Regions:
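Positively charged, solvent-exposed patches that mediate nucleic-acid binding
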Residues: 45
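Long, contiguous binding/interaction regions
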Residues: 1-41, 49-86
Length: 86
């Protein structure tokens, strides 16, 4: 069974976001004065193959996030796990 995984990471509350600040400044300089805040994160899509149980796939995704895809000290992550058809 194959699984489609969609992962989003973002900085934890209270962590400075220099990329978000730069994007906000850029948008304001382009005339988008109504932009109050911008937060930059990451979005990843991964396909896992040959895993028969959803809980095993979820455990693998959590391990990947904690070991490489997110920095658990400064980032939060969330994911969606969906069984692929076919």
């Amino acid at each position: 069974m194959d699984w489609e995984v969609k992962i989003e990471t973002k900085l934890k509350d209270g962590i400075l976001d220099p990329q978000g600040k730069a994007v906000k400044t850029g948008l304001k300089s382009l005339g988008y004065d109504n932009v109050e805040s911008v937060y930059v994160g990451k979005y990843l899509e991964i396909v896992l193959e040959d895993i028969n149980q959803k809980n095993k796939a979820a455990k693998m995704v959590e391990e990947m996030c904690n070991k490489l895809l997110a920095n658990p000290v400064i980032e939060d992550y969330s994911y969606q796990l969906k069984k692929m058809e076919g």
